[in-house]
A protein has these predicted regions:
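Short coil/turn connectors at secondary-structure junctions
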Residues: 60-64, 123, 144-147
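Short beta-strand segments
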Residues: 67-69, 129, 152-154
Length: 176
């Protein structure tokens, strides 16, 4: 989404987005996605300096931006999110490489659920890449959260251009 109206996105809507996002399945029910809502002008300026120039104004005018991150410490909460399999999870996740890979995979999956939840509630999304190392230093330094995606959200202004081509079934699937 290139432009958004000035209609506000409420805290109740943000809560509902989170709740819908976390209904989707993840391996081990791990739920490694973390969401940082960017709502203040000060936080937004800290965010936009880590975006490419073409996306900075889009982010500035969006009612809300979300930084989606994976939590490398997700295993520490296994007793909460999957108490029946907590020991299995810990026995599987024995290296930092495995823990990080699982966190990234789960958070990427949840990022898709996130954008689907936003759209299901009648809002629009604009996913953006960023300087993720810079975002880490800016917002998450010293924590186990590592950003993977920035998403602008709000009520979109219809564009004058038609939707770009989407691949068809035969272009992207095969049956064996």
């Amino acid at each position: 989404m290139r432009k958004f109206t000035d209609w506000p996105v409420t805290d109740d809507q943000l809560r509902e987005i989170q709740e819908l996002t976390y209904l989707g399945p993840t391996a081990f029910n791990s739920q490694p996605l973390r969401i940082t809502w960017i709502k203040s002008p000060e936080a937004r300026e800290r965010l936009v300096k880590h975006l490419i120039e073409a996306n900075q104004e889009k982010a500035r005018q969006a009612p809300v931006n979300a930084i989606l991150s994976y939590d490398k410490a997700w295993v520490d909460r296994a007793d909460v999110f999957n108490p029946r399999a907590a020991e299995t999870i810990r026995s599987y996740c024995t290296t930092e490489e495995i823990v990080t890979f699982a966190a990234q995979q789960g958070a990427n999956l949840q990022a898709g659920y996130f954008m689907t939840a936003v759209r299901a509630l009648g809002l629009d999304t604009g996913p953006l890449w960023a300087d993720f190392e810079g975002l880490y230093e800016e917002f998450f330094a010293g924590t186990d959260e590592h950003p993977i995606l920035v998403v602008n959200l709000g009520y979109g202004v219809p564009t004058q251009y038609p939707r770009d081509t989407r691949f068809g079934f035969d272009d992207v699937t095969r049956s064996l």
